[in-house]
């Protein structure tokens, strides 16, 4: 009953908001805290110095979350738990205890990543009552570093999509997680709510997960920064899966410098300094410049010009057979592994829910079609709208195509002496939020550039570069680097964001 009353309150607050962005701005201003300009590093420093309290910052974040309820960014908003954690930080801080890296900083966690005591739905109705008893390791590391978890964020159902148009969970009048910059547009996915919460300046940081673009696509559409780490860099336990070969948790934040803080908390290592732009060599692959809308094309080319002027070496490179190899890996691996990985996960939850029961309750037509037609029967799309057995294609992908794709990346970085390849994270700015946003055509388009690196297992960062000249919506640039080069990639990203500057807040443009 308490959770029902809380949900009713959130929905009422969302509908009552006369102006979402204006109301969000006032929610922060009333606390004397500039949420619009705050970064994770600044928040941690000011909390440590005693310039602000965690109670004030957390209260401001919660107020803005309620004021922006029609964005559907949250599935669960844990006001009581967050304020308790914030108060505990403030009490400890008065005793001059050492400051932790995230001490007192409000963060959000995607709802397929387990947090003790809060529902972990993976955005699907069958799991709405699953409440884990312990944190997933990635969430535990943020909490151990002092983070205050204010809630679990909405997502594309079961992480199987790029739009975030999920009808199963909403706090506003219309379904689908909405863009921080235009509530009629998609937030992207599948880590939709985390990106929307950061873009709306509710929080400065959070966690998502990424199989084929799910921390990078929504950050590109909401003006935030993110890292898809090298597969295996972060622990994957306690996260509702798609594919053990491709899945990884990923940090999302206001800036790449903030992402670097989260990476250190999760993976360890010392501070990361920005790279010298004059010592950075970046390749551009022509095939990744296909299907761009005008705003993305203009913004990306302008970003490359800025990099050249700052001393970055930018060269054209060729990656032959990239699309062909990627096609032989992507769907065969994700769709085939999804069955066994989800069965194992459901068993571990102890809910007694079977994968068939899970599929029966799926609310999103696109995801239900994928589960019923492909995942459950272990099939793959075939020619002329047919389906074929998934096992032969999966075996071929793992034995031949994926190693060849990894070799292509490795050889390209080595032969052309590249630190990274650069490309528009997504080909278009955010599209209208409606059921059609989850179409197969849109899915294929939006993963065009993020999917290949995912299948190769290499790290990638998303850096905001501009607002589109016509749309005034965020445009992002991605850098993919060699396997294991996560820290070098973050250093380059920190240098790049100094060149590009931070995007204006939604209330300021």
What is each of the regions a protein language model found here?
Residues 50, 104, 144, 203, ...:
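Glycine-rich, small-residue loops and helix-cap segments
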Residues 67, 148, 199-290, 301-310, ...:
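Structural helix-boundary/capping segments
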Residues 58-59, 87, 295-320, 343-362, ...:
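Acyltransferase
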Residues 30-211, 230, 302-305, 310, ...:
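Gly/Ser-rich catalytic/binding loops embedded in alpha/beta enzyme cores
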Residues 36, 113-119, 248, 265-351:
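Gly/Ser-rich, acidic/histidine-flanked active-site/gating loops
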Residues 12-21:
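Bacterial N-terminal signal peptides
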Residues 102-122, 279-281, 336-404, 462-473:
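Short helix-loop capping/hinge segments that flank enzyme active sites or metal/cofactor-binding pockets
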Residues 2-12:
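Bacterial N-terminal signal peptides that target proteins for export
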């Amino acid at each position: 009953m308490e959770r029902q009353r809380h949900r009713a309150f959130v929905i009422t607050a969302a509908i009552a908001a006369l102006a979402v962005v204006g109301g969000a701005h006032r929610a922060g201003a009333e606390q004397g805290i500039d949420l619009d300009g705050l970064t994770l590093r600044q928040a941690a420093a000011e909390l440590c110095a005693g310039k602000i309290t965690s109670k004030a910052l957390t209260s401001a974040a919660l107020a803005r979350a309620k004021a922006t309820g029609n964005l559907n960014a949250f599935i669960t908003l844990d006001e009581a738990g967050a304020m308790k954690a914030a108060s505990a930080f403030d009490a400890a801080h008065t005793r001059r205890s050492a400051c932790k890296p995230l001490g007192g900083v409000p963060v959000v966690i995607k709802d397929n990543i387990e947090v003790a005591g809060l529902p972990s739905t993976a955005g699907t109705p069958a799991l709405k009552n699953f409440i884990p008893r312990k944190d997933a390791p990635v969430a535990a590391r943020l909490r151990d570093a002092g983070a205050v978890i204010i809630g679990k964020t909405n997502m594309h159902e079961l992480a199987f999509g790029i739009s975030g148009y999920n009808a199963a969970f909403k706090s506003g009048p219309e379904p689908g997680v909405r863009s921080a910059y235009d509530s009629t547009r998609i937030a992207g996915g599948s880590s939709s709510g985390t990106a929307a919460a950061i873009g709306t300046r509710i929080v400065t940081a959070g966690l998502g997960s990424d199989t084929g673009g799910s921390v990078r696509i929504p950050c590109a559409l909401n003006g935030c920064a993110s890292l898809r780490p090298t597969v295996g860099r972060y622990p994957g336990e306690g996260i509702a899966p798609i594919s053990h070969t491709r899945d990884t948790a990923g940090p999302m934040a206001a800036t790449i410098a903030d992402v670097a803080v989260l990476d250190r908390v999760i993976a360890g290592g010392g501070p990361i300094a920005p790279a010298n732009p004059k010592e950075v060599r970046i390749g551009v692959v022509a095939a990744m410049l296909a299907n761009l809308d005008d705003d993305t094309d203009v913004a990306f080319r302008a970003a490359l010009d800025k990099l050249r002027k700052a001393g970055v070496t930018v060269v054209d490179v060729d990656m032959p057979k990239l699309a062909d190899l990627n096609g032989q890996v992507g769907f065969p691996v994700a769709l085939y592994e999804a069955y066994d990985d989800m069965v194992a996960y459901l068993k571990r939850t102890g809910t007694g829910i079977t994968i068939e029961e899970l599929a029966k309750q799926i609310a999103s037509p696109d995801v239900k079609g994928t589960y019923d037609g492909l995942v459950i029967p272990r099939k793959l799309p075939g020619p002329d709208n047919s389906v074929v057995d998934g096992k032969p294609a999966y075996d071929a992908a793992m034995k031949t195509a994926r190693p060849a794709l990894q070799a292509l990346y490795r050889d390209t970085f080595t032969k052309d002496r590249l630190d990274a390849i650069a490309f528009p994270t997504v080909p278009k700015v955010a599209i209208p939020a409606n059921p059609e946003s989850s179409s197969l055509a849109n899915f294929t388009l939006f993963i065009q550039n993020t999917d290949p690196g995912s299948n190769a297992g290499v790290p990638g960062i998303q850096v905001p570069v501009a607002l589109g000249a016509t749309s005034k919506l965020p445009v992002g640039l991605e850098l993919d680097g060699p396997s294991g080069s996560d820290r070098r990639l973050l250093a380059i990203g920190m240098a790049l964001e100094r060149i590009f500057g931070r995007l204006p807040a939604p209330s300021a443009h």
